[in-house]
């Protein structure tokens, strides 16, 4: 069998594995608030998230097109198949490490950093599509900041509207609303996160001359990635649910709805303009913004600091892992 075909098959398998892991690693963030407030039972939340992630993944492909062509040029990438496989293995390794320790790291940072690191190892810094790459990095940096500010503002407005309401009654009403916002957040998660694997597989198909257009995501790729993420979601990432849903702040239904709406708005906005963002950090930052508006001292800033450190180090670490994986695979293939 042709070595290029073997590499492409391995890439498809690893990309679907990445999406599967992304499902149980990142989807915890989308349902963490609804589980922590008991708006949904854990198993019901997981099923809801799995279905909505699948639906979201089947709805859009704009982010996939960005991943396909804006980090590196798939048509000219030197030793492209090895680069892509190395990036996937590096991102999967980092995701599993952070999942094991219950750290809400970003699959987006991991795969984007790993692709950049592997491409630089293969062909130097000239391999990067700087215009597209910088645009992606800007989105990754700005989106959690915007989420924090928007979460703070939205919850401040909610507090003002319900300042004279009975707290217990208000939370009971918001608990019902939170089922809807959890579904919405899971849907938007699927519209952005599942597309990263779609873009990677399409990039690999172009590199192997099995596909021609970076602006056309094959239907089978979209369906396979949506299914992988849905299945991964069905397993659930309980360690990360505990961190996002309880260790940042004590979340009440009114807090959860505000955070869910903020996160969903930012993620869907990014999807609409075809930009990949870290759903992990957007959702976590939304909760931090809501928490700061509710009561600054009520936020566990130690957990927030640990998440911030992970946010900062994921790109360089995944880039380094991508480069190391490339050098190893290049000796094999």
Curated annotation (Swiss-Prot):
Predominant localisation class: membrane
Topology relative to the membrane: Multi-pass membrane protein
Keyword terms of this UniProt record: Cell membrane, Membrane, Phosphate transport, Symport, Transmembrane, Transmembrane helix, Transport
Domain of life: Bacteria
PANTHER family: PHOSPHATE TRANSPORTER (PTHR11101:SF80)
Pfam family, one: PHO4
Subcellular location: Cell membrane
GO MF, any single term: phosphate transmembrane transporter activity
Name listed for the protein in its UniProt record: Probable low-affinity inorganic phosphate transporter
Family membership: Belongs to the inorganic phosphate transporter (PiT) (TC 2.A.20) family. Pit subfamily.
